[in-house]
């Protein structure tokens, strides 16, 4: 029981250290982007890229980062299981959507003209 509490305290300290270091890296990223804007682009790009890689690596060492990595891997696995339609099916669906859209547009246009005619008959505007 005592070992478990010590291990938990050690884990909590490590977790706090990781997130603190990550916060410091983000602050460094913002400050370096602000202060080194007058320096050469190569220096600025190298610094910002290294800070980004370091902070991303540190994020993936945390518990939340590991969960995100597992979620990403399972999402990629699920996309590989999807059966995508072939060209023929895609073409048929596309033409069906186009034809239905044109038919509905013609129906709405006809209803609009009938309503305009009916309203002009009632108000005797005779358009």
Curated annotation (Swiss-Prot):
The family classification in the record reads: Belongs to the SecE/SEC61-gamma family.
Q: How does it sit in the membrane?
A: Multi-pass membrane protein
Q: Name one Pfam family in it.
A: SecE
Q: How does the record describe its quaternary structure?
A: Component of the Sec protein translocase complex. Heterotrimer consisting of SecY, SecE and SecG subunits. The heterotrimers can form oligomers, although 1 heterotrimer is thought to be able to translocate proteins. Interacts with the ribosome. Interacts with SecDF, and other proteins may be involved. Interacts with SecA.
- Listed PANTHER family: PROTEIN TRANSLOCASE SUBUNIT SECE
Q: List the disulfide bonds in this chain.
A: none
The protein depicted here goes by the name Protein translocase subunit SecE
Q: Indicate where this protein is primarily found.
A: membrane
GO CC, one annotated term: plasma membrane
Q: What does this protein do?
A: Essential subunit of the Sec protein translocation channel SecYEG. Clamps together the 2 halves of SecY. May contact the channel plug during translocation.
